[in-house]
């Protein structure tokens, strides 16, 4: 069972290009060569989320979902981590590798879902639900993680909740993922915070059904950050890395409708060139497109390596508290 209530939601600042350097006359191939040189010189590793632009995904040493990137950050022997994702991901890399220097190439790479919860709003919810164990999705700030018992990703959220000794859970901040978890773990009483990922929340089942009329034989794969009606229309519900595994379950299927941020199509097409991947459209007829994930370009990575911008720093007390919640998460196996 679950209980969803609404907090006051902070609005993420607009993506800004204030810090984006301009190199209009440098061909991409030359820029990539310079990045490769600087990467070796700095003993750096470049990590990229599956939602990044194709050029960044192809350049990265490792591309994956939040959990996979967290594991990679914790295990790397590189001196410098350049994290091509959004701010909370770079923070998590710093938390898990406090001795490494971690850089976010573009300061505009925020997250509206992470902005939907603050330590103060979490405290309010703790007062409303005393005795509940706080499970926080990694799409959150380091300060919120530090005030949580354990974190989770979309790849292990169900296993994390099942692993807890308590029957009462406060799940934050994504209500759609929280609902999905509550359905999979009905034996626990789950109170659900009311944040959303705007990119996923815009999608409606009617839009998915319209796409299915064009491709009736298609397999639908949805991210659990999608609304409940979209999840119910899907054949598979999983994280982005889980989507790669899900495709392998349908060896005879040729067409897949993918209900997540459009950047995932690139990874799927690379892995399965003989299959067709159709991006699910939002209710306003547009691709599911996260502006924060798409703000990082090749020149941002170049200047991050060249000028060592922009380094992630965290208060030691916050870092230690957040580390405990992340390490507890990483001790739990993946769901998908």
Predicted regions and their residues:
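Active-site loop-to-helix "anion-binding N-cap" substructures in soluble metabolic enzymes
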Residues: 2-258, 264-265, 269-336
């Amino acid at each position: 069972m679950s209980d969803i209530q609404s907090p006051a939601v902070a609005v993420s600042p607009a993506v800004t290009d204030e810090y984006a350097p301009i190199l209009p006359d440098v061909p991409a191939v030359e820029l990539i060569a310079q990045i490769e040189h600087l990467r070796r010189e700095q003993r750096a590793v470049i990590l990229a989320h599956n939602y990044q632009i194709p050029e960044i995904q192809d350049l990265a040493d490792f591309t994956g979902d939040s959990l996979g990137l967290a594991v990679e950050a914790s295990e790397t022997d590189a001196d410098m981590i350049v994290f091509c994702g959004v701010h909370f991901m770079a923070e998590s890399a710093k938390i898990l590798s406090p001795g490494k220097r971690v850089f976010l190439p573009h300061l505009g790479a925020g997250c509206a879902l992470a902005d939907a919860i603050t330590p103060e709003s979490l405290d309010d919810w703790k007062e409303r639900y005393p005795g509940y164990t706080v499970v926080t999705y990694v799409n959150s700030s380091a300060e919120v993680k530090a005030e949580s018992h354990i974190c989770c990703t979309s790849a292990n959220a169900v296993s994390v909740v099942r692993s807890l000794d308590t029957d009462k859970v406060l799940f934050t901040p994504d209500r759609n993922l929280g609902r999905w978890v509550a359905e999979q773990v009905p034996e626990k009483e789950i109170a659900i915070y009311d944040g959303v990922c705007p990119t996923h929340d815009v999608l409606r089942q009617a839009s998915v059904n319209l796409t299915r009329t064009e491709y009736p034989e298609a397999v639908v794969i949805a991210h659990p950050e999608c609304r409940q009606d979209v999840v119910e229309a899907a054949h598979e519900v999983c994280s982005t890395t889980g989507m790669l595994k899900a495709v392998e379950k349908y060896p005879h299927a040729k067409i897949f409708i993918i209900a997540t941020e459009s950047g995932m199509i690139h990874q799927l097409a690379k892995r399965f060139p003989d299959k067709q991947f159709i991006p699910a459209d939002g209710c306003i007829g547009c691709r599911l497109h996260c502006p924060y994930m798409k703000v990082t370009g090749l020149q941002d990575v170049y200047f991050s390596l060249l000028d060592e911008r922009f380094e992630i720093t965290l208060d030691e007390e916050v870092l230690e508290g957040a580390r405990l919640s992340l390490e507890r998460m990483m001790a739990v196996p993946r769901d998908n």
